[in-house]
Each structure stands twice: as C-alpha cells, then as structure tokens.
Curated annotation (Swiss-Prot):
InterPro entries: ATP_synth_F0_asu, ATP_synth_F0_asu_AS, ATP_synth_F0_asu_bact/mt, F0_ATP_A_sf
Database matches in SUPFAM superfamilies: F1F0 ATP synthase subunit A
Endpoints of the signal sequence: none
Protein name: ATP synthase subunit a
Keyword Metal-binding attached: no
Membrane topology: Multi-pass membrane protein
One Pfam family recorded for the sequence: ATP-synt_A
GO cellular component labels: plasma membrane; proton-transporting ATP synthase complex
Functional summary from the UniProt entry: Key component of the proton channel; it plays a direct role in the translocation of protons across the membrane.
Localization: Cell membrane
Sequence similarity: Belongs to the ATPase A chain family.
Length: 295
C-alpha cells in the first residue's frame, strides 16, 4: 500500500492523493552560499538508479567474451536493441557513435520510471520535473554540439533558421523565429514535459485506486474495494507498459534530433520523419554478430 506520506481517510471520509506525495520530506539539508541543498527520498532514488544502471552495465561488459552468456548476453541484447532499432534506424550508420549514450539514456529513464511500482520505493523519480528537465537539457546540448561540429556554427544556425532558402524574404522572416523557438526551446521543453506529465499522472491515478481499495475493503461496501484493488493491479501493469513506452519515445526523439543536426536540413525534421514513432521506419543493417563485433 502507499506510503504514510499520502493522506488517508480516518472518520471523515476518503481522502485521495495530493501533489504533496511528490514532495518528500528532506532528510537533511545545507546551504552553500545563496544555494540551498537538500537530500530526500527522491534524491536517494535518483542516486540509486544512476548507480544501479551504471553498475549493471559495467558488470555486463567488464569481462566481455566472444560468445556472450548470462548478464553479458542480457546487456548486449539491450544494447543491440537501442543500436539497431533506434540509433541506426533513426540516425543511420553514423548512429553507432551515439549508441552508448542512447543506451544509457534508455536504461536510466526506464529504471527511473519503474521505481513507481517497486515496493518500498513507490516513487517514479521522473515524476519530478527537475529530472526530465536535466535529461532533456543534456540531449539538447548534445544534438546542438553535434550540429555545430558537423557543419560549423554559421551553417548550422542558418539551416535551422532558414529551412527553405529559396522561399521569399517575408517567409524567411516569419519562419526564422518560429524555427528558433521550435528547435532551441520547444524541443527540450516537450521532451521534459511529456515524460514528467505521463509519469506524474500515471502515478496519481494508480494511487487513487490503491487508496480507494485500502479505504473501502474494511467497509460494508468492500466489493467496491475489491474492484478498486483489481483496478490498481491492472493499472500497475498498464503503468509498466507506459514506463517502457516513455523511455523509448524519449530515446527515439533524442536520436531524431541528433540525426537532424547531422543532416542539418531543417534542424531535425528530416530525421524525425524517419523515426519509428513518426510512422516510417528505415531499413537498418541487422547483423546477428553485432554484439560479437563490438566485443
């Protein structure tokens, strides 16, 4: 059942979850000049996820053998999925360069999301906007740096602001600020908000039914409590599916933006058109020995 931080019902009726469940109490805090630092359950879970993902992948690849087995085989399966189905499928052959980052990104977001249904934890760290914003900022920084290194700052920003060089001047004047806002502001913002909103709303909905079952089961209307409990179980399974989907979408869009920066045709729309979530998949060289070649 949900943690004690959730307001429960006593004799005054049922109380559903409030946004306070996403604001855990600080375990300790300190000031560093004008900046306040605090450490709480969210901080601990975020640190745990980072150490878990890093340690898991390190253990899987630290003693790689020609024929992968056990943990190495599992880790390479994850890497191959991201490398072939996301990096190369969206970016192209050059996507291999970004496969390590995309793999870590996918695994980190996935484990962070799954924290919502792990006993004791029961808190998706991506349901706090700070973490999705940081992840989006890192992806934003990478695809812009890639574009600048690939084409030079002048060409990259010119192609971004003027995606249609043959268009009339007044069209260019209208498009330039729109393209700037779209690439430099809207992309990282939508990456962060999409992930945050899905995890926040999903966890709130799950809490409603879990709290409803906890409140109704001891009552004469216990049948409704059973229904609420079954809904909580069903929503847990549904949330697991959403956890995977949101990690996949975030990673695919990051790959699409990197691919767009490499092609520098409209700053990313070209690559986005070829991403699986835009309904068009390109062929990618799939080799059964892909993991062996890297090992």
């Amino acid at each position: 059942m949900p943690s004690g931080s959730v307001l429960m019902a006593a004799d005054d009726g049922f109380h559903g979850p409030t946004p306070d469940v996403f604001k855990p109490k600080s375990w300790f805090e300190f000031d560093l000049g004008p900046i306040d630092f605090y450490f709480n359950k969210w901080s601990a879970l975020t640190l745990f996820v980072a150490l878990f993902v890093g340690g898991f992948l390190w253990l899987g690849f630290r003693k790689a053998t020609l024929v992968p087995r056990g943990l190495q085989n599992f880790c390479e399966s994850i890497y191959d999925f991201v490398d072939l189905q996301i990096a190369q499928n969206v970016i192209g052959e050059r996507g291999r360069t970004f496969s390590p980052y995309l793999t870590i990104l996918f695994c980190f977001i996935l484990v962070s999301n799954v924290m919502a249904v792990i006993p004791v934890a029961q808190f998706p760290t991506t349901s706090r906007i700070a973490l999705p914003m940081i992840l989006a900022a890192v992806s934003w920084f990478i695809f812009n740096i890639v574009g600048i290194r690939e084409h030079g700052a002048g060409t990259y920003f010119k192609d971004m602001l003027v995606p249609a060089p043959t268009a009339p001047l007044f069209v260019k004047v209208i498009l330039a600020p729109i393209e700037f806002v779209s690439t430099m502001i809207a992309r990282p913002a939508t990456l962060a908000i999409r992930l945050f909103a899905n995890m926040f709303a999903g966890h709130m909905l799950l809490l409603v039914f879990a709290l409803g079952a906890d409140y109704l089961l001891p009552k004469p209307q216990f049948v409704f409590g059973l229904v609420s409990g079954l809904m909580a179980i069903a929503l847990t399974l549904f949330e697991l599916m959403i956890d995977v989907l949101q990690a996949y979408i975030f990673t695919v869009l990051t790959a699409a933006y990197i691919g767009g920066a490499i092609s520098s045709h409209g700053g990313g729309d070209h690559a986005a058109d070829h991403s699986p979530i835009h309904g068009h998949e390109t062929s990618a060289p799939v080799t059964a020995a892909g993991a062996v070649a890297r090992a």
